[in-house]
Amino acid sequence: YEDPIEIIKHLMIGSEGTLAFFSDITYYTVVDEKHKACTLMIYETIETACDVVPLLKKTPVSAVELLDRESIRSIEEDPEAPAYFRTLPETACLLLVEIQADDEETMAKKETAVRGGVASIPTIQPYKFTSDPKEYNFNWKARKGLLSTIGGLRPTGTTCLIEDVAFPIDKLGAAC
């Protein structure tokens, strides 16, 4: 690009003052399949939950999110929250796991594959995949609202830092 207007049209200003120029872009999108189900896999510790992530990577999951005990505590009084949230051990950690498929038969196969993939590491309690809109939506609402919820619980005068960090997946448990 040589025309200054075209150059300006291809600039992007990101967070923390990042400036980028796009000369070419290709989007790779994720298919939003018709059927969705999610579950909460609860583990004794964050390290154990992190050790499950490499196993889940080998299965047909569409999303995995980690919620530590502080995250769970921040939503346990929500009227839609499961009662067992309030009785979890202080070290508990959960994984919100989602699967998607175009048909029920494929969903069942994916659920079986996920269960088999993580069977070697026990959860605190049995888990079930749910497509029930109320349960499904609460699980994702809880995850998506964490930043504001936890940020609001911090002591006065403190700051909530949010930074992206990356670790090799097989070192995730040790990193936590």
Task: Label the predicted regions.
Residues 1-176:
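Noncatalytic alpha-helical scaffold of FAD-dependent oxidoreductases
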